[in-house]
Structure formats: structure tokens, C-alpha cells
């Protein structure tokens, strides 16, 4: 053991004496003996991973800085959905760089998530204020995927008559960002949706359309009045989605006011860096009548057991973890951390600050337009917010711009497009004008006053924005800092205690991995900048793709998918494209085990596949006979199998190769869900097992944080025969020669996050990666063995061992004690712990995944809490008013009148060590039903 290595900092148990004690509890003599009992010998790798030895933290810090310095972010006026902006230092320091914010999990356990729930409610409120809509979700992945989600939402909202009539056409205005159009192409094809791409102002509805998509302002910057178009669409029973720039809505009439049914877009320019494409918070807002068809998470307002206001995730019955293939979307992880930052940006700036930012961009555009007109240039758009589309010789302008360290966008050889932003200065405007003047051999004219606004009078905003108290109360940095801290203290994160959520892999997000995200060379790159300006990024991306391919045993990798669910979808679409290339597009049946996570069937449904469920046996394994029967039955139409390995039940199934062979023999491909890859790395891999494609959750196995509900990255790795079909992009060269259309707005997805996983691999090296996997398995088996006398492990492998997680059986608690696993989860909050995964994949169980990062002392505390809670359950049997069912207990309740049969100390300090760092839940048990029945998804005074 040497604490000079990253591995010994990352892995929680490095002390040999502690490790021996754990192995003794398990009943094995060595780690190797345990691994041999856990992983079938037939799939064990025969040689170590072909990766370099791990760097030290110091070496990596120097290395990653050098890579960042090889990026050369020029002053970007490219626009196209990505803009330089002022990221408030107070938000960057207190949120983006703060582990209390970035290490928390999605707020399913709302009582210990009130801080980030309020931050997300602020985001929703800001979106509603700007768009003029009635209900908003708390983020999507990016603008392109948000638009695609809106398309499918409009498709789902078709009336019965429209469905009977076979309305499958979607009008798309051609003045749309190309990456957004590409996403629409990707998502529409599996549903048989026909895109009609045309000009909105000359289009006549035929009655075959179910919806329409327009951009506001348009891709070329034009501000257009869509009111008559919307009226015509509605007259033909078609709904309209507006893809709207949020900053522009500080000055422009809200889409909700001119009739749009859905409003989507990106919130990037409200306080989050470009980051070479992400992560950013996509958004969606709509009419309340459509709330049950809306994708993504919605934060609502409810009450707790004591009648206090409490926040929660509302209307969860729409989502994939419950509705599976009938869900509104496959989206799971979104962009919660970025949405929180946007919310704080709006809190900090308020209405005045937002208008000032918008006016800065608009004034710069107006001043430049006037100056260019004086030089004889022709603008294709006369009414604009921040973007000018200019007739000019692109090659000449580009050469002069690069000399000055400036990037524009060049839609064609005869046009130049430039977008201004909130950080544009008068000197920069003068520089741009001088550049265009030089191109014509002229001298620029200096104006003494600002040009008048070009916004049409009918489209100028008259309604107020950000009127809620929260957007007026925290305008100084001291006030904002304290507000952020108040919210922070209401949440449990990895900064407080272990989060043992099964199937979520809440491991350490090391500071050495997070620091590079704040480097200017990574933050300030535009995703559509020439790649020669992004040498550091391109080297990092190429190396990371190689490393992930090596780790998975596959041939190639795409980093474009920006969530695990997006990776699932991308992998299935690649398989689909492969079958189509062989003239077998009719292969559309996908086999999915009954135990699969809900995203699997939801993603398959979005990929246009017919789902056939495979049974599981009494031990939780795939019923191989049932799988073979169904593979043979559907052999002529079999697309493939989606399988999680180790299984969702936490065990390595010994017949996995037999399963893979059966699918291949029937003509199908094998998609492996990488959710549990933390139990494979360095010991086995999907390629060695026989899978054709797998997705990875970099925010699980590879040390990216969860961010309270995202962002994440979900790359796919594929075998050689699938390499040609990796996702492409309409602006940057990426993907295979026959690549599917884009699955994310940016060519390399959420590229700003990639240094995390890159560093994780570089600092652990092949040996460290293997050790991390081994210790994840050791920790899970230690806890399973140590708890065996009190909690039975529901499933185990043939040798009685589990993989990297285990399912604790609480199925008798309701009968024996009148207490269910939800009550146990709430009681754990009083002990300062986030509960494990509840009732998945088996009802009334807890799925525990300790990961390799937890120290033995922390695991022991968690187990002591579980055992003590069981004693409390035994003592409370038959009593309605008991310490477990009333949990969690707030400080206010403890300090108030007390009539319970148990003491205040028993409620708040049931074990001695809790007093050392007591976490106080901010609210008591929340009434979920009330929040759904009385949906409020914005701040209330």
C-alpha cells in the first residue's frame, strides 16, 4: 500500500488488516479466491488490460493542463446554439465545483433532497416565466434531443381521429439548426414519421400533419411572427413546437403568447460554459393539459406529514422506471446540475440582469448591422435578436477573422453568420466591423450612438419576467452564497455519507478528476470550431475512445450519447442500421429479460422495436430455455437481445455465453447494458463474452458524478462489423462511414466531462482498474455476509456469492412489523444515510451497492444502522405511532411539542456516532399523492 498512488486514494479499503478482516467475514482466504467464486472461469480474461501504468495525481495534473493548453479557443461568434456567456464565479465556485452539489443523486428521496429540488424549481419557474407556458420539466439533455422529444410528444397527443386517419407528417421549417434537424431525422424514422421540411411562410397544411416545428429566432437569426402560421396549424388539428432561445425571450414576445403548444431549447447561455458541446440543460415547457405526456422529471410542490410545504418529483408514473415501454420517453439522467446553475444565474441576475444581457447582445448586433450596411453588405435577415446572416465571400472573411483570433459560422461559400452574446464589448464590435471593412478595402465608419432595435413592434415583449421573490432577494454575492449554502445543507450527498444505491454506482468523484473541468482551455471551446483549434480535445477524445474500446474488448467507440438512456438508444439504432444494410430491416424483435431496468424497454420502444419479454427463474437468472424458445420462434425477425451483466439481480450468470450464442444463432445481435460494468473492468468484458455493442455509464463505472440527476455520458462501444454505423453529425466529421444520424446536438456529446473519465483511466492504469473492480466485489460480499444474520440476500450466484451489489430481503417486514421498505428508507435519513434502491428489481427489497470507494468504517456504520432499524421494527410491531413509520424527524419537530411513545433521543440520535455530524432532514415524510393531485411546478410566493 502506498498513498502516493491514485488507486490507494480512490479505493476505500487499502489497509491489509481491514481487508483480511473483511475476507474472514466472507469466509475466503484471498481476493483471488473470492473473485474465482464470483465470476465464471469461462469468461475470465486471460491477460491484463493493455493499458499503461497509472500516473500520479501530480503527473496527471501537469498532463491534463498541457492538453487544455493545446486547445486554442478563439473569440467565438459562431452561435448555432452555443454562446460565450458570463458564468458567475459565485455559482461556479459554490455549485459547479462543490461536491455537495455534484455528488448527490437524483432526488427520488425527496425528504433529503429539498435543496436541489428548490434549485430545480427555480429553473422551472424561470423557464415558465420566459416562455409564457404553464408547466415545465427540470431539464432535458440538449436542444436537439428536446426538440425530438417534443416531436414524439405531439405524436402521442394525436386525437383518436388523427390516429385513425394515419396522420404521420411533421412540418419542420427549414430555418432550423442543422443539428436539431438531424436529431428529428434520427428519432422520427423508427416511428414512421415523415418530415416535411419547407418554408413556414408559404406552407399550406394538408390535414395530414400532426405537428409543426419552428425556431424562434430562426437559425439565420431572423425574428419572425408565427401567429398566423400557428392559427393555421391549429385549424388543421396540428400542434406547434417553438425551439426558442431563452435569452432572446427577455426581449421577445413569449411563444406561449403567440400560441405555441410546446416550447423547447437549450439554457446553455444562461450561465453555463460551452464546453465543446456540453453538458447543458435542455428545457421543455408546455400547456398543463399535456402534463401526462411530457417527458423528463417535473418538480412539484406538496406537503409533508406535519403539513409543511415540501418539494418532490411529481407525476413519476409517466417515467421509464415505472411505465417501461409505455413511458413518455426513455430519458432517465438529464442535466440537473446545469439546470441548477441556470436557476442560480437567474436568481443572481434577476429580471434586470437578464434584460441587460439580452440588450447587450441585441445592441451589438444592431450596431454591427448598421455599420455593415454602410459598407455595402447585404443582410438576409432584417429583423434579428443577436444573429446576422450576411452575403459575403466566406473564404475571404474567414481568413481575415482567423488572423484576428475570431470564429464565425459559414453556412455556404457566399454567406457568413455571426452571433453576439452578453459578453460582447464595443471594442469587439469595432473589430468585427473593421474586419469586414478590410475585406472590401474600406475604412469603417464610427457611429456616435447605438443603432435602433430591429425587433418588430408586434414581437417586443411587454409581459414581465422573473417576478417571483426568489429572483429579487439574492442579488449580492453574500446573499447568493448564503442562499446556495442553505439549500446545500438540506441535501445528502457523498460529502455527507455513503450512498449505497444499487445499480447506480455512487463511487468517489475525486477532486483530481474534477479540477480540469474549470480550465479555460476546456470550458471555452465551441463545438463547431475548426478541429485544428481543439488539438487537446481531439487527442483526449481519441485516447479515451481507444481506452474504452480496450476495456470493453470491442473495436470502436462513440462518445456522442450524453446519457445512459441515450447510449442504449444509440446502440439499438446502430444494430438496426446494421440489419438494414444487409437488407434485413424487417428484423425488429428485441428480447428483454423481465428483470431489466425500465430504460431498456423504453429505449427499445423508441427505436421502433417489438419487445418480447424473457422470463427469469426463481434465482433471478435469465430462463435460458425460455430465451432459446423465443429466439427460435422469432428467428426470422429477431433484431437482438438486451442483457445487463452482471444481472440486475447482482449476480454473474454462468450461462451467459450460451445465451449470447443462442441469439447469434438466430441471426440477432447482442446489446449489453453497461450499467453494471463496475463489476467487469479488468476481469472480463462484453467483447470477450460475445456482445456486439454495449453502452457505458461514465457517471457510474468511470467516476463522473451524478450531479443530482445529471449530466451523464453514455458512450457506446461496438464490434468491428458495427463500426461503420456509429453516430455521425451534420457539422463535424465523426462516426462511421455509414453512420446513423446524430443522437446528440454536439459531435462529441458532453465533451467537457470527458477529462474526468480520461483521468480516471490514466491515473488508475490497468492494474488499478482491476483492483477497483475486485474491491467493489469484495465490499458487496462483505456487506452481504456481515448482514446475513439480520437480512437475507435475496439472490446469489451458484457459489452463494454476489457480484458488486446485493438485494436485501424485506418482504416479511410488512407482515411481521407493519413496516415496509419505504419506511426503512425514511428511517435511514434519521441516521444520516441515503437509502439503497427501493423495490427494484424485486418488490419490498433494498438493493445495496457499496462501490470500491467506501472505507470499511463507513460500511460498518451503515450496517449498524440497518441492524438497529430492524430492532426498532421489532419493538414497534403493532404500534401505529412508532419511530420508523414517523421518520424522518426534523429539528423543528424534535424541538417542538412531543407526544410520541418514543423519546426525542431515540428519534434523532438512535446511535452514539450520529451526534458527531448529525444530518437533519429539512422536511418530514412527504405526501406524494398530494403533489400529483395538486400539481404546482413553479415558485409560489
Which residues are covered by each model-predicted region?
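Non-catalytic terminal extensions of PLP-dependent enzymes
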Residues: 1-25, 37-77, 86-102, 108-111, ...
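Conserved PLP-enzyme active-site core in the AAT-like
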Residues: 10, 145-310, 372, 385, ...
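TRNA-binding/sensing appendages of the translation machinery
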Residues: 28-42, 260-265, 691-694
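Cysteine-centered functional microenvironments
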Residues: 106-107, 526-529, 559-561, 614, ...
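Flexible, glycine/proline-enriched loop segments at strand-loop-helix junctions
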Residues: 107-115, 136-139, 168-175, 215, ...
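Short loop-beta-helix segment that forms the pyridoxal 5′-phosphate
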Residues: 108-112, 129-148, 548-571
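General small-molecule cofactor/ligand-binding pocket signal
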Residues: 136, 194-198, 380, 409, ...
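Conserved phosphate/anionic-ligand binding catalytic regions in large, soluble enzymes, centered on
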Residues: 272-285, 289-290, 334-338, 424, ...
